[in-house]
């Protein structure tokens, strides 16, 4: 993915995520944070031969790697997984 690719809005969610802010980062990556600014993690849209799905992931401590929480068919589910 080109790092200069324009960020895209997260596909329409079933309900507005109460108490969360979803910020487009680049291309198909969004940061999910609480309204106080604490970053919960990221949602990334991944497309393969089965179609698009949404991967929830968290940054591990100060490391530069992510812990994948799960992959979901709907963006709402990927965002919800980061709440817990």
PLM regions with names:
Residues 61-84:
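A short, charged, amphipathic alpha-helix used as a generic interaction element across diverse proteins
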Residues 4, 11-12, 52, 74-77:
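Generic signature of intrinsically disordered, low-complexity, basic-rich segments
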Residues 19-20, 36, 57, 76:
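Low-complexity, intrinsically disordered short peptide segments enriched in small/polar/basic residues
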Residues 25, 46-49, 82:
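Compositionally biased, intrinsically disordered low-complexity segments
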Residues 1-35, 64-68:
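Negatively charged, low-complexity tracts enriched in Asp/Glu with abundant Ser/Thr
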Residues 29, 43, 71-74:
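A generic structural signal for ordered secondary structure
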Residues 22-24, 50, 54, 76:
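Generic preference for hydrophobic/aromatic residues in regular secondary structure cores
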Residues 40-65:
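Short aromatic-glycine-(Arg/Gly/Cys) micro-motifs in beta-strand/loop hairpins
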